[in-house]
Each structure stands twice: as structure tokens, then as C-alpha cells.
């Protein structure tokens, strides 16, 4: 492989082949987006990037702009002269999206080229099968593999009944039971984490996504806040969530047990 350092970020033979047709450009993966400014990881490290004027002009909707997780082609791999330019976006193998803000008809891509989506739902006050079905639909439409993660099992007295209810709408997706408080079920998540694979977490505010990620990392990489005693919900603290998954994924591959 011509770009060995990018392999751990999911740069497969399929992307390498497509990138080979862009003479004079270099592949990179988008790890963060803040309005019109991007962070990308290339063979030599992380850089700040912007979309080229030509790509902006050719864009017909928001889906034609880079999103977190996209593989893009940039004009150089050094940051000595300001932002590098994103010239093209490689064809996405998967993406999940939502309606753009402001009631527009346009669709905004939340994350691209995801292999596995962990759908998190707590077993206490957040338990909602209709919401789970909506998340499942989003996951299947994205072309990624959904995995259902039921959190806060330590706060549930009827786990078996809840599992039966979830199984009735799971469409065959794997189901895992976790307790961040007791670290129960965390090891089961590791079998989905491997070099070159990208995972994402979705779920309602307060279900324990940030805490679960911190458990996987073995340190606090995403902020969490205290649990409200009134309803056992963790106050929402995650920001730029989708962008974090790609920065962390390479590290996850190195902390698998064994």
C-alpha cells in the first residue's frame, strides 16, 4: 500500500484505487468540521483544510460538501502555507444524514464511511421502542451495520422483558447490555473495534454515550456531567460528537484486550 499510515484510518484498497486517478493530489480523511474549516488526517499528520472554490461552485446541495469521515483529495500534505485545499471527495461507501437546520429540504451528512453504528438506549427512563425503530431505520439506510447497546442495566429491574421488546424490533441486529456504573458488558463492545474500521454512536441525550466511549478509551476523552438524582439521566455534555469518533478510532484499535 502506498499510504501505510492511512490504513489504520480505514483507507482500504477501494479508496486507494479511486485516489490513484487524481494526479498531483493526496488522500486525507476528514476528522472534524467547524463551519467552513475542516481538520483532515493525511499520511504525514493532521492539517487544517478548506474546500476549494471549484468544489464549492460545483456543489448543488450540502451533500456535495465534505463531511466528517469523508475521504478527500487535498492539494498538498504540509501546513506551512495556511490551510490545504480539498479538491475532491471520494465516493462514500456509507453515510448517515439528517435534515438541514432551519426547516430546509436539504439533507446534511452527519458522518460518512462508517462501518458500525452503535445505537445507544438506556434501560431506565429513556427506554423508547419507537425512537429505537427510527434510529434503526437511519442505520440501515446509511449502509452501516447497526448494533443496539442497552445502557444503564444497573437501573433496570426487568431486563429480560426489555430485551424481548427490543428483539421484536431489532431486525436481527446484535443486542448488547451495558452498565457504565458497573463496567458490565464493556468487553463485548471491543469485538467490533479493529484497525481500519470506523464506528459511531447515536442515541438520545443522557443515555451514556460519552461515558461508554471514555470506558473504552480507559481515560476521559469526552466530557460528561453529573447524574441528576431526579431521573437518573446524565446531563448532556458531548459536543462535536461525530467528529470525535474518527479521531479516537485509531487509538481504540490499540487498546483491545489481549
Q: Would you name each region that the model predicts?
A:
Residues 87, 176, 255:
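General small-molecule cofactor/ligand-binding pocket signal
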Residues 143, 172-174, 221, 251:
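A generic structural signal for alpha->beta connector loops
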